């Protein structure tokens, strides 16, 4: 399709189908070389006479190219293997001393050790893989000069030996791919193959004018002899093909051996130029083209990453490379022209998006893998090197892998592994020709490979995903039996449980800890009855879920508990009417969710443990708020009798008074007064103080502990309005109040205002109610903030904690109040509203009187007196 101009699939032309009108010409540097495998064992056995003969055969300005290898200056030997190079020098050039210096030409770095040079490269040339070491002799000293190769745009490396070769290189490398021009239509096959397999099991002798020598290297680069000098720039050349003889083997890249891959970025828009004919266009025909940029590794690397840089990237390149932006733009345009890269703006954006977000094209793609023989030398290096030539879309990865049948590719890319040539074929091979293979197996026929052990372990172990495996019934039974014997198991018991249940020590200890917590809450939140043996029941296996909900009593508003402490509050799907009816019935029966009840509800409602647990928790919260309000209303009445008919089933239960019956256990005003007074003295009573309060108030110790816990939470959140008044009053006069208050309990609730007995604080209040103008107002939260503002005019962060404690407001509320004052000051309006402040003071006093639960000597507000008078009638 014409619009898909960025198609990177080369047109494969069979040797037998070559157009007679096209002349077969082998050009000097017409593109990146075909990577040909060579057997290393043969490399070691080839004599020096054969090397000399090969050197003579390549006299016609042949330019040897090695990918990141070593080149011998005394002969034409080249190899990427340092040990192989050392072996060659020792055997062929015994007079050369290898224990010499290493020099990094780029940085002027000199060292005697190769390890130091490697460390230097890691530090100052990170990510650079294009090194070449050249051995030279200076002043009777052998020096290895490390340089960075000139990188052509197809991933191969070129070392220009002399000016003549450099000239021919410039001419030949400036050709434009015929596959991008209408000329290609003359040679194009009917079908563009998406997968290309290169094999070497059989080779053909080709005309002598295209003869190439196979060097005994680990990875040898085969190239064509240089073309004649009379070759014009418009001549076309066709690369020899390698004929396949065996079906390709397709392997899957799923299996990866970590740490064995050396990954370099490859631009798939580039193709092996030996597989693509070119139209030779001189680069110097482009105006203002700066040829010096061709050797700039920064620009070459940038182009290889993406051929269409953005303006910001061009600006950065201009600053780093010390060239003008215009020169860099022209250089990129020339490279795209040379390599036939012509994309529409939409294709550029699509390719950029897919490259940088890790997306790989869905077009079936193939990597041709050419493995070499296993080296028999004891050089300690990886035994197998595979060179992967990628043919596909932008953003893929070219890898050089050590190992067999493995490739660290994360995308589903099919690998076609060519056959390994025999030793005789390697010796005889001249220039094999490649042609497209129709027998290439599709990617779907890939051989399945096992996943890595580490990945399987991660999948098997649920803890790696934060999911705790649910315990079986047998494990829970053993744990519960042990728990009933001892709630704090010894190490020997834990070891025994570990052997029996198969659980870890941490899981067992956490189960015991959570179960103790749940049972303690269950005990403290239930009313104590003689026939109630639920205190010996293990409530819930808290380890069955990642998060567990405490079994909170209905009257204890455990508002600080979040059933999902590590996550944001979860929103579950709406429950049906039938599910709600089942949940409501279970909650009315018992607000404590046992393990058996939870399993029954799961089976009946089809809800998850979390959904059921969260519903019960929210239900307890809402019910606790209602009961707290009811308790305040009832305590204001000062009534000593229990009004069981006005409360709903499952109300908060404490220890019942001596004369009370049923399950309604409510604290009297005297008991509440004692608890509040003690709370003002200390929020964390000692065990002796708990026992003393239980003896004086008649309440159960568990109820007192539970009340202190809830009150501490309410105080922390600023919900205790009575705390300030109790704190301001004389605590010593409040302590011995209980006996005095009990004397006057028979008085009518709505009696007239009289002077109280034995209650200095109460008398002050009652007198103040009567006096009117001489009323002493306790400062509310806003009043405290107002006094502070009038004194300081702004909020000092150092005083914020003190203001929050005194005003019982939140941190944000205090900050917002001061911000509002600041805004009013800037607008020039009145800072405070006096009427609103007065009403707030009075309302707070009334609310405080409702919550203090004082005795009948207290004169309630009018709306409470109306309520009490109706109840008396």
Swiss-Prot record:
Localization terms from the record: Nucleus
Residue ranges, annotated region (Required for dimerization): 272-432
DNA-binding region: 284-346, 464-526, 569-630, 660-722, 777-832
Region (Required for repressor activity): 831-873
Family matches, as InterPro entries: HD (IPR001356), Homeodomain-like_sf (IPR009057), Homez_homeobox_dom (IPR024578), ZHX_Znf_C2H2 (IPR041057), Znf_C2H2_sf (IPR036236), Znf_C2H2_type (IPR013087)
Region named Disordered: 1-63, 202-236, 626-667, 732-769, 829-873
Gene Ontology CC, one term: nucleoplasm
Biased composition (Acidic residues): 18-30, 831-857
CDD domains: homeodomain (cd00086)
Composition skew (Low complexity), residue ranges: 223-236
GO terms for biological process, alphabetical: negative regulation of transcription by RNA polymerase II; regulation of transcription by RNA polymerase II
Phosphoserine carried by residues: 45, 47-48, 202, 648, 774
ZnF locations on chain (C2H2-type): 70-93, 102-125
UniProtKB keywords: DNA-binding, Homeobox, Isopeptide bond, Metal-binding, Nucleus, Phosphoprotein, Repeat, Repressor, Transcription, Transcription regulation, Ubl conjugation, Zinc, Zinc-finger
Subunit structure, interactors included: Forms homodimers. Also forms heterodimers with ZHX3 which is a prerequisite for repressor activity and with ZHX2. Interacts with NFYA. Interacts with ATF7IP.
Record's function text: Acts as a transcriptional repressor.
Family recorded in the similarity comment: Belongs to the ZHX family.
Protein's recorded name: Zinc fingers and homeoboxes protein 1
Protein species of origin: Gorilla gorilla gorilla (Western lowland gorilla)
């Amino acid at each position: 399709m014409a619009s898909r101009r960025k198609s990177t699939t080369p047109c494969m032309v069979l040797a037998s189908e070559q157009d007679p009108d096209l002349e077969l010409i082998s050009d000097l540097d017409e593109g990146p070389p075909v990577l040909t495998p060579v057997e290393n064992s043969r490399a070691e056995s080839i004599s020096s006479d054969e090397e000399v003969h090969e050197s003579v055969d390549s006299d016609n300005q042949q330019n040897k190219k090695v990918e990141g290898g070593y080149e011998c200056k005394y002969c034409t030997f080249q190899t990427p293997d340092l040990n192989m190079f050392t072996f060659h020098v020792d055997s062929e050039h015994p007079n050369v001393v290898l224990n010499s210096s290493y020099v990094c030409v780029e940085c002027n770095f000199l060292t005697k050790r190769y390890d130091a040079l490697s460390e230097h490269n890691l530090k100052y040339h990170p990510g650079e893989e294009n090194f070449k070491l050249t051995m030279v002799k200076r002043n009777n000293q052998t020096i290895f000069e490390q340089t960075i190769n000139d990188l052509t745009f197809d991933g191969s490396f070129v070392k220009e030996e002399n000016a003549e070769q450099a000239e021919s290189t410039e001419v030949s490398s400036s050709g434009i791919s015929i596959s991008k021009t209408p000329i290609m239509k003359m040679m194009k096959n009917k079908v563009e193959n998406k997968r290309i397999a290169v094999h070497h099991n059989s080779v053909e002798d080709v005309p002598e004018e295209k003869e190439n020598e196979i060097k005994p290297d680990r990875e040898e680069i085969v190239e064509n002899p240089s073309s004649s000098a009379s070759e014009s720039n418009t001549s076309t050349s066709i690369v020899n093909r390698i004929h396949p003889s065996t079906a390709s083997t397709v392997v899957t890249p799923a299996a990866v051996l970590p740490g064995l891959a050396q990954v370099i970025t490859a631009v798939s828009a580039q193709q092996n130029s030996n597989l693509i004919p070119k139209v030779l266009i001189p680069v110097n025909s482009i105006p203002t083209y700066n040829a010096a940029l061709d050797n700039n590794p920064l620009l070459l690397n940038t182009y290889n990453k993406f051929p269409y840089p953005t303006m910001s990237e061009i600006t950065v390149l201009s600053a780093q490379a010390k060239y003008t932006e215009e020169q860099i733009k022209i250089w990129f345009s020339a490279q795209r022209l040379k390599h036939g890269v012509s994309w529409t703006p939409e294709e550029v954006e699509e390719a950029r998006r897919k490259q940088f977000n890790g997306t790989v094209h869905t077009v079936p793609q193939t990597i041709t893998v050419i493995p070499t023989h296993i080296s028999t030398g004891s050089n300690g290096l990886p035994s197998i090197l595979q060179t992967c030539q990628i043919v596909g879309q932008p953003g893929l990865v070219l890898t050089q892998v050590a190992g067999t049948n493995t490739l660290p590719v994360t995308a589903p890319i099919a690998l076609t592994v060519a056959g390994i040539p025999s030793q005789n074929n390697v010796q005889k091979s001249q220039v094999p020709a490649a042609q497209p293979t129709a027998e290439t197996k599709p990617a779907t026929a890939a051989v399945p490979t096992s996943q890595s052990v580490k990945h399987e372990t991660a999948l098997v172990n649920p803890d790696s995903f934060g999911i705790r495996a649910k315990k079986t019934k047998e494990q829970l039974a053993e744990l519960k039996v042990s728990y009933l014997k001892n709630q704090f198991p010894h190490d020997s018991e834990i070891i025994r449980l570990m052997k029996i249940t198969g659980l870890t020590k941490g899981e067992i200890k956490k189960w015991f800890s959570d179960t103790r917590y749940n049972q303690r809450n269950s005990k403290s939140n239930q009313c104590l009855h003689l026939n109630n043996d639920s205190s010996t029941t293990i409530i819930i296996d808290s380890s069955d879920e990642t998060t567990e909900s405490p079994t909170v009593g209905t009257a204890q508003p455990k508002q600080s508990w979040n059933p999902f402490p590590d996550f944001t509050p979860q929103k579950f799907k709406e429950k049906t009417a039938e599910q709600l009816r089942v949940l409501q019935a279970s909650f009315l029966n018992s607000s404590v969710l046992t393990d058996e009840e939870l399993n029954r509800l799961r089976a009946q409602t089809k809800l998850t443990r979390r959904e059921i647990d969260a519903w019960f928790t929210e239900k307890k919260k809402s019910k606790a708020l209602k009961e707290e309000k009811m308790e305040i209303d009832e305590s204001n009445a000062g009534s000593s009798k229990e009004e069981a008919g006005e409360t709903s089933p499952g109300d908060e239960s404490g220890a019942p008074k001596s004369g009370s019956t049923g399950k309604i256990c409510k604290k009297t005003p005297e008991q509440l007064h004692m608890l509040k007074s003690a709370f003002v003295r200390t929020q964390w009573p000692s065990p002796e103080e708990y026992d003393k309060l239980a003896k004086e108030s008649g309440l159960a110790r568990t109820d007192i502990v539970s009340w202190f816990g809830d009150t501490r939470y309410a105080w922390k959140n600023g919900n205790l309005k009575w705390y300030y008044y109790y704190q301001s009053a004389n605590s010593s006069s409040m302590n011995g109040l209980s006996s005095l208050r009990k004397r006057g309990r028979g008085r009518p609730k709505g009696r007239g205002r009289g002077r109280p007995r034995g209650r200095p604080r109460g008398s002050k209040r009652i007198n103040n109610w009567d006096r009117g103008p001489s009323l002493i107002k306790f400062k509310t939260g806003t009043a405290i903030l107002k006094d502070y503002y009038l004194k300081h005019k702004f909020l000092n962060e150092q005083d914020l904690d003190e203001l929050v404690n005194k005003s019982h407001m939140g941190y944000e509320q205090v900050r917002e109040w001061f911000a509002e004052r600041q805004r009013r000051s800037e607008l020039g309006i009145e800072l405070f509203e006096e009427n609103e402040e007065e009403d707030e003071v009075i309302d707070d006093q009334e609310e405080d009187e409702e919550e203090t639960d004082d005795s009948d000597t207290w004169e309630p507000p009018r709306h409470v007196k109306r309520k009490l008078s109706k109840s008396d009638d």
